[in-house]
């Protein structure tokens, strides 16, 4: 269970921390959510060169388009006007590595002492208890410094900005297959029909809500049962 965190360079304040099974977009979106809701919009995020931050580190064969040089994380930053800078230079990681050493050493001991064994309980303890206490002990009071954070966006804006975008096509049954399930597009509770192979973009919001954009329209997605499940519910005459 890697621990990821963001640190305010000026005050050494941990502004976000999160446990996940591996370092992926999901974990970093949870970090981003903490920053946006608790502190506001930062001027700049400085990260390493891992793929979740730097699209150009992908093998060219795995890129969706040579013109698309932003990761989804980078796209979210752009939408909020945040500068995203990446680097592989080790000396730039000194503050984070020093903080992580103290951070993880104390955290592991506290999780053991409190009998915490699940990732959900670990995140609850990390966010609600450990980070506030850690900042009180080791960081300067960020409120005493001139803030470079802009006002927090609305929760709705955060929810739709921290989204996962996935290209799809409408099939012959006017449905979209997304992670093994079928969905159909609706607008104001009315089914909308499109030609087969129409390109679309599925939007999974931070809260799990699914939407789709088709022909510059934003539509709701409703789960559509697979045919074998549909046939089970037919009444035979």
List PLM regions with ranges.
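Active-site-proximal structural scaffolding
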Residues: 66-70, 127, 195
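RNase H-like DDE/DDD metal-dependent nuclease/strand-transfer catalytic core used by mobile genetic elements
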Residues: 3, 9-121, 226
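Hydrophobic alpha-helical segments, especially N-terminal targeting/anchoring helices
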Residues: 7-8, 204
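Short helix-capping and hinge/turn segments at secondary-structure transitions, especially at repeat
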Residues: 105-112, 116, 127-143
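C-terminal, beta-rich DNA-binding module of retroviral/retroelements integrases
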Residues: 131-237
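Hydrophobic beta-strand positions
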Residues: 6-7, 211
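Short loop/turn microsegments at loop-to-beta-strand junctions
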Residues: 2-3, 172
